[in-house]
Amino acid sequence: MSELSVRSRRRIKIRGGHLGAFLCWAVVFADIGTSIYYVPGILYGNFQTRSAVFVLMTLFVFILLCIKYAEVTWRYPEGGGVVNVSSQALHPFAGLLGGTFILVDYYLTAAISALSGMIYLSVVAPGLTPWILVGTVASLLLLGVLNVLGIKESARTTAIFATAAAVGQVAVVLATAVYLGPTGILHSFSAVTRGPALSLPVMVMGYGAAFLAFSGLESIAQLAPAMREPRKSVSYRAMGAVVLTMVITSPLLTLWSTTLLSPNTDPQQFISVLGAHAAGQLLGDYVAISGSILLIFASNTAIIGAYHVFIALTRMGFLPRVLEHRNRWRLTPHWAILAAVWLPVVLIVVTRGQVGVLGDLYAFGLLGTFVLTCISLDLVRWREYKRWSPGVIAFFSVGVLTTLLVIIAWMINLYFKPDATKFGGGLTVIGLIAGLTTYRYYRNRRPAVFPVSFRPQRAKESIATALGSMRSGEHVLVILPHEQLAAEAVIAEAARAASGRGAVFLYRGVRHPHQHHELLEVGDPYLKDYAAVDAFSRAELLSRKLVPNRRYVYVPGNLPREMVAEVWRTVSPLETVVTDEDQGMLPPMAIDRIRRHTLEGTTVLHMYTSKVRAMPQSATA
């Protein structure tokens, strides 16, 4: 067997993070599990005792969404969620749009979670009631200060409070079931038949509004860089645990909190009051305390997620680079943190701490994120599926159905919630204008380049899909060296060689064995490899006038050198431009001729192959 065959079959080991299924469940539940504390009250204001009907309607779509988000997690191990999947599946500008959607979602999550946390805390400390608004603003500012100081939550700490809150929620379900008894449970289901008439407009509005009960699902995709291998198995097990927890708690707690309690009960304290009603004040206080702590954690998680989105969009070239600057004192991105905190504070003040108003504003960003993620994943599946067996067709059809159901919910909210449309749409337009303006500003100075995502286990598919028609051998493969002067010499030679044709620029990053990923950080190695960003920017700046078709491929430094050979085999070029020092990264091949040019002390090779083929073993020995 030839050396080339051995290399091509070599298994590439991918180092994962440290989060197993339980810790991933905990972080996701710390976000999505907080919805039960305020969603029943929000739905009750519009739909009264019918609220549980609409939660059940959206529960089916939620389960389908969990399948999609688990796949996004293992397909995109660098994380980034909607920003990453949409930029790679659609276009980098779609990533900007997804970033604005998720920022709207994060802003409202931070505001409504902090506010609800203070409301539940007032159950055990009634003296806080007049100070809820002030306390909420103070808690958001304090969270901002803690993040600037570099004091962040860990997954293990989150797991403690997520488990405590989950135990409290399940305890309320069990206590209420015991309190009602079998006959009472059956009778409670009939309570949903009382209330406003279920006309078509009411059904449509309820379906769109109830998606708020499952906000926070998107956080699983942000955990991918920290997730333990095998990510595919861990992501599905974590999402399975999330589904099980939500199926047990969300519909039943919504049903009983909206049908069993007195009409005079504060809707924003439903779950705590239900626990006290079924099992005594001790359980009610436990739910209030554990819920308020988890809500504050969810608010902090939203702030962390938001400022990491700001940093990712900055590194992609869509926002001013000042947002990425870190202070010398604590090495934290203080400007990005400020950008993540100020608007939730403004929202709390402007709405005067009204949970219902904040809930109405929620739908735009949340459902917009779901829609863009679903469409992107459907396109990725469509491109990668080669054999359309009945099982594959059924699976793909279910994915498309999920997308359609989410689009319908988003359209409903755009129509029936004009305030959310104005608020979310306004922020989205501002974000797009800022992003495109920044991109244009840097275009002639330090242009942003979006390379092909290189995935070791699906290298051929990912590169072939991204390059499309450029896979013709008429194009030149250019391997950029790390040294700047040598890189400029290679770019100059490549621009002349590929003039009027096309070029694929390849850069292999530097290995950082001890690189640390923060929780919810976008772990794309290219965005953190400033040398690669500069190399591609120079290549774009120097070659775009001469080379009409340009593509860029980035190979992370933690992958073996053989991955460069994998790219070469996929691109199948007839000409390769490389320095003499980097020639060893190429696979053994039959070379027709080599031209050598020396520019400013750098020897640049032009290697020509009339037919791409491996050298026999005897020739490589």
Identify the role of each PLM range:
Residues 1-39, 63, 67, 75-79, ...:
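Membrane-interface "cap" regions at the ends of multi-pass membrane proteins
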Residues 10-11, 159-216, 222, 228, ...:
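Helix-loop-helix junctions that connect adjacent transmembrane segments
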Residues 40-88, 92-101, 108-139, 243-247:
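Extracellular loop-to-transmembrane helix junctions
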Residues 91, 238-300, 323-352:
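TM-loop-TM module centered on a large, flexible mid-protein loop between adjacent transmembrane helices
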Residues 132-182, 238-242, 359-372, 394-406, ...:
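Membrane-interface loop-to-helix entry segments
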Residues 157, 322-335, 370-418, 451-454:
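C-terminal membrane-solvent junction of multi-pass transporters and transport-like membrane proteins
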Residues 164-191, 254-261, 373-387, 414, ...:
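Hydrophobic alpha-helical segments and their helix-loop junctions in multi-pass secondary transporters
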Residues 472-526, 604-609:
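Small/aliphatic-rich secondary-structure junction motif
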